[in-house]
Amino acid sequence: MADTHPAVSIVVNTYNRGAWLDDALRGLAGLDYPMFEVIVVNGPSTDTSAAVIARWGKSIKALRCDHANLSVSRNIGIAAAAGEIIAFIDDDAVPHPQWLRRLTAAYRDPAVGAVGGFTVDNTGTHWQVRKVVCDRYGNAHPVTDLFDERPLNRPGSAFFPSLLGTNASFRAQALRGIGGFDHTYAYLLDETDVCLRLVDAGWQVHYEPHALVWHQFAPSHIRSGECVARTLYPSAVSKGYFITRHGSPGNLAGAGEALESYRRELLDVNAQFAASGTIDARHRHALDQDLLHGLRDGQRLAMAAGHKTGGDLAQVAQRPPRRFQPFAVASGRRIALISRGWPPDNDNGIARWTQLVAQGLCARGHKVHILTEAIDGARETISFEQGLWIHRLCPDEASARTGALVERYGLPWRQAAWADRVWQEAHFLKSFGLDCVSFPIWDLEGLPLLDDPDFVTVVSLHTTYALAQPFKPEWTERPLLAHRQFAPMIAAETAVLARAPHCLANSRAIIAAIADRHGIDLAPRAMVVEHGTPDPWIRRAAAAEARRVARHDHAPLRVLFVGRFEQRKGFDIAVQVAQAVIDMPNVELAFLGGELDGAARALINRLGASAILLHPRIHFAGVVQRDCLDDAYVGADVALMPSRFESFGLVAIEAMAAGLPVLTLDAGALPDVVRDDHGGRIFAQGPDVVQQIAAELVWLNVDREELALRADQARAAWAARYSTEAMAQGIEAFVAHVLATHAGKG
């Protein structure tokens, strides 16, 4: 093959997998290969598949298969393929960016007719299939990675290399030469049959271990998401057909034994599933009957096929393929964002910001990886979700590397273990072509990367331990904990801030606060990109309009406090405002974001505000999911945010996006966000701040025209400055600046 990068046609066969298909196509957009087209063959789908395909428009070749038959669908794809190489990947799978480069390299040998890679299962961390050798009864025999399959590539071989359909490629000339796929294989053994016929035709079938695909095991009409069969009929037909066609001619008795062995094996599996409660008796009976009827029909079809040697491509290949249609790859950078928390399990400020940044960068064509912690008790996974690679990791505090990081950086064990696991995963991502990695200053999650020359690393600035310390009296109340945990973290933070070459700040205030608290001027090394947040009205337009009308009609004024029940968030001030609200007959106040636990109740009692706990116009909703929080924003009139420090104030812009005037303190970055011309009001921290806020609520309750005006100002300010699109564009420019600076130094 003259061209070292031959044109490749990637065929995706889909049937009622609309929920996964879009991610499969977005995964292909992340490939690093100069010339490939994508062909999507949609079966008789009744879900959203057609709509997903339509959204991709002319970037793909979209075809239709009227039968729920994988081999027919594959042949339709082959008939449309204009590339020299035809690759297959499932509609619930995503490739490594180097997938095509690895596969096509083997085709420089003109004897090679097929190449397949290694496939990772739905955990994202364990193998589904690596090298597999099959016999002429369709039985798979796993072999070691070091097994040399090349000697098996001879016509008539009892054993031959077989590829997995979700990670397989073929020389178009070879695949068409054997007639493509046999339509009898509606499901199972379709690619095994093709590999056998290629070998018998004199072609070589090879494995390429570095051609990786992640297979997510989506449910189908054949199996559930837990890989429990819904029906065994199509696979039993394929097995009966394969054994009879390829096994019987050489050994009739052996073929009979293979059929009986397969029958017994699956009947035993069905019995085990029934005994464990995985399936009920009716399901078991149906599967047993599917198996028996399928094997019988497969044998009958094989005998009826007689001396047929090729596939059925000619039945669907009525005309030459359309011209090659290059697929547009994502041209952006490959960026890793580190956040130990990740929504919905953790929706704190950094986790939420990381998610919004990731989604915004992805929408602008960048390839984004999230390195986050697996939830307690869960195993590690890697998955591709809505265009994002999500790496859910488990730190190991007992590892020797963790101890080394504790000694080197003075980190507490918990933080060191996480930083070590992040560093390991980042090294794995080097094979993806990682351009940049970002970690937050809080907890120093990616600290070792800062000193690793293999990575371009940036630090995002948020509240540091040192900045939080004045609002955490419990830190000083436990001297031993402060000595072991907080003092080392503050020292490590200061060391990082002193040498981090690139810092992403969310406000000028955080740069000033760090200079004041840590004694380090970051201005020459930091770029400010303000936070952004999505529009909550997109799915709540009717609710927003209903609230506007209620506001105009003097319905009770709804005030919303969102935040943890702690001093830094001004929970104590909000409690005292709630006590004042009791005397305002047309005002309600709701608390979201914190648990009304013993500590919160004790604080309320100390403030003499126990009456709010049972008052009908004061509500404690606890920690809520994002959708419920956005519902609360849209259903409120005013946001109360009396924080004593915020590096930016994400809650403020979330409220403004919903059209809420924000009442806050003159603290941190809040005066830059909550301005008079943004519909907000800033209150000086002092002994009468509660009375001032209460007076403001009285005024807004009375003057609904003023309230409406300020609601419009808040919404307009969000649209102009704090959208996710604006944030993503700013961070994109920041990353470009960082990489240009790094390239200049190189």
Regions found by a protein language model. Give the residues of each.
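N-proximal low-complexity "stem/linker" segments adjacent to membrane-targeting elements
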Residues: 1-27, 327-329
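Aromatic "clamp/platform" in nucleotide-sugar-dependent glycosyltransferases that forms part
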Residues: 66, 644
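Acceptor-binding helix/loop patch of EC 2.4 sugar-transfer enzymes
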Residues: 400-409, 453-491, 536
